Amino acid sequence: MSYKEEELKEFASQLAQCMENIDQFMVIYLIGNLGAGKTTFARGFLNFFGFDKVKSPTYSIVETYETENKIIHHFDCYRLTNPEELDLIGIRDYENQNCIHLIEWPEMAEGIVSSPDISIQIDGENDLRDINLNSGSFIGEKIFSCLDF
């Protein structure tokens, strides 16, 4: 699937809508090179939940967004020098029911972050982004069945 930037955000919003009423801890890996659109995807996802101002957690490592019934933690692991740095910030304390983790650069935190329910590979530059989705769990499959490809 190929998307322009606004279409990528719309797809992310559709994914968020499919996850809105699932009452369990869920993990989404956002995979791609620098500038591929991982943070753009996260913005579209968070826009669905009413967050218009979404900043990249590149320097803070994690930004948290709370709604009435969901907590979304947006992680950017790009700057980690050691995956165990996430243990130092208490990543396990972020894993709760009704919680979603959006994790950019999950390969930098291998062995520390939870396995994904959904992995999203974003490739491309300029105007178009190619998206490849993979399910890592039953709940991931359930979410995929809701999506309108």
Predicted regions, residues:
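Short phosphate-coordinating micro-motif centered on Lys-Gly-acidic
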Residues: T81-E84, R92-F149
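Phosphate-binding P-loop
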Residues: C18-F25
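Short beta-strand-centered segment that lines the nucleotide-binding/catalytic pocket of NTP-utilizing
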Residues: F51-E66
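Short hydrophobic/aromatic beta-strand immediately N-terminal to the Walker A/P-loop
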Residues: V27-Y29
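N-terminal pre-Walker A segment at the start of P-loop NTPase domains
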Residues: M1-C18
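Conserved lysine of the Walker
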Residues: K38
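P-loop (Walker A) phosphate-binding loop of NTP-binding proteins
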Residues: I31-N33
